[in-house]
Amino acid sequence: MLQTLKTYFGYDSFRPLQEDIIRHLIDRKDALVLMPTGGGKSICYQLPALLSEGTAVVVSPLISLMKDQVETLCANGIAAGALNSNNDETENASLRRACMEGKLKLLYISPEKLLAEANYLLRDMHISLFAIDEAHCISQWGHDFRPEYTQMGILHQLFPQVPIIALTATADKITREDIIKQLHLNQPRIFISSFDRPNLSLTVKRGYQQKEKSKAILDFIARHPGESGIIYCMSRSKTETVAQMLQKQGIKSAVYHAGLSPARRDEAQDDFINDRVQVVCATIAFGMGIDKSNVRWVIHYNLPKSIESFYQEIGRAGRDGMPSDTLLFYSLADLILLTKFATDSGQQSINLEKLQRMQQYAEADICRRCILLSYFGENTTCDCGNCDVCKNPPERFDGTIIVQKALSAIARSEQQIGTGILVDILRGNMSSEVTERGYHRLKTFGAGREVPARDWHDYLLQMLQLGYFEIAYNENNHLKITQSGTDVLFGRARALLVTIRREEAVQATRGRKRKATVPTKELPLGLPNTESGELFEALRTLRKRLADQEALPAYIVLSDKVLHLLSASRPTTIEEFGNISGIGEYKKKKYGKEFVELIRKYS
C-alpha cells in the first residue's frame, strides 16, 4: 500500500485517517468521510481503485472538477477518464470501450450521466467501488443541495456488492445523517478528520463601507504580489464592480457568476487555473471545481450565509499546506440582507440558526479558529496564534456616551430609522432623506461628528451583539431599543465597547516574508534565503514552460510546495529528485532530468 502511494503520488506516509479509510474500503465496506479541503480526500478512493480489480466510478458535480482530477491522475501515470457532455460522442464511445475492457482505473461521471448509464454501461463494467464526491450536495440540509444527487440512492439497489464511499469537506450532524439515509449506506463507518487548517490565517474587518473595502483589498493584494486569490461577493453586480476596480489598478482579474454564459465561466476558470489572471471575483458559484493548490488568499466581500459555506470557501486557499491568508468583511447591511434571504427561504429556522452562528464567528472576541472547530464538533482550549483575535486581543473601554448618543438618535426619530440614516444623523450629514424627514432638527444631529462613519458602523454592530437594540426586519429594518439599551440610555447601566484599531490589517504580518515560505521542519539549516528565492523562481519558470507544452495547469506538473522543497534540498541526481515528497515514479522519469539540470546550475 505504501509502495503504491509512493509510486503514484510521491508520498512516503499517509495523512491521519487515510490508511484506515483505504483499508476499510478495500474490505468492501461503506464509508462516510469528512475531511477538510486540502486534507487528502481524493487519495482515500484513488488508492483503493489502484489496489482493486476493475474500475472505480467517481460521481462529481462539476465538469471542471472532473477535468482537473483526471488531468492530475494522468500526470501521475494513472489511467483515468471523465464521461460527460463536454466530450464528443467519439470520445465518450472510446471511454465506454476502455471501461468495458477494464483499461481505466477511475471513471469520473456526473450524477445525471450516472443515472443514464446505470442500466447500460455500468452493467457491463467490473466496478471496484463508487465514490460520491461533494456528498453534502445530496442533502436538503447541506449548503449546496442539488436535486439530481438524491437519485443516487439506487446504486446500492443495482450494485449491492459494490462498496460506496461518500466524501465531503463540510457537513454538520443533520447533513451527515441525511447523506447516509439518502445513499442507503450499509452500516457505514464515519471517518471525521480534524477540520483545523492551521496554515490559514483568519481576519475579520467590521463596518467597512465600499471605499474603505476597496482600499483595504488593494493593500491586502499588495502584500501578495503575483499570488493567486479569490474574492467572494454576495451579488453578481458586485463581482463586476470589484473586478473593474482591480483592473484599473493593473491587477489582472476575471469575473465568475451564474449570469455568465458557460463559455465565459469556463474561460474565467481556465485563465485562473493557468495563472493568466491573478484574481477571480466570484459569487459562491465558483470554486467547487477548483483544485488549484497555490491559491494564497481568499477575501469575503460580504458575510457568508453559514459557517459551512465560509469554511469551504476559505478552504480553497493553501491546499498545499503553505501559509495563506483569509479576510472577511462584515457589515450590518450584510446581516439585514442575509436575514431576509433566510426568512424567505423554505427552511427559515435552520437557515436563521446557521446565519446566527456565522454572525457569532464574525463578532467573536475569542479565538476564531476555536469557534470554527467547535461548530464542527471539535473542541480546543488553546489559542491558535494565527487569527486576528489571538494576534491582537481586543481591549475594551467605557463606551457609555457613544452608545447613549446612538440610542438617543434612535429614540428621537421614534425608532423609525435604519443604520444608514442613523449614521448620517450622528455624523451631521445633510442627506436628502435626513432633510426630507426633518432629522437635521433633532438635538442629536451631529452629536457624533467626531467619530468616523466606519467606526460608527463598527460600534453599531457591537451594540447589536450586546443587545442594546434589535432590527425589525418586518418594518423596513428599523432599529428598536431593547430593555438593556434603555438601561444604558438612562444611565442605569454602563456599556463596554471594544477599542477600534485604526491600523490597516496587517500590522500583525509586518516583517513576515511570505515568499518562498516552507514549514520550518522541512527546511535544511543554513540555506541562504536569497539564493533559494532565485532558484524557486527559476523552477517556476521551468514548470510553466513544461505545463504550457502539455496544455496543463502549472500546479499539476509540480505543486508550489514541491518547488519549495526542491529549492531547499537541491537534489542533484534523478534518484534524489524522486525522493522529494509529492514526486512519484511517473513524474520522476518524466521531469527529473530537466529539473535536476536546472538545480545543478545553482548548486
PLM regions and their residue ranges:
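Flexible coil/turn residues that form the inter-helical turn or adjacent wing/linker of helix-turn-helix
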Residues: 160, 225, 365, 415, ...
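Helicase motor core with emphasis on the C-terminal RecA-like subdomain
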Residues: 1-8, 12-16, 20-42, 50-52, ...
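Short, charged low-complexity linear segments at domain edges
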Residues: 347-376
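Accessory DNA-binding and partner-docking regions appended to nucleic-acid-acting proteins
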Residues: 1, 350-352, 381-603
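Short helix-to-turn junction characteristic of helix-turn-helix DNA-binding domains
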Residues: 25, 221, 272, 362, ...
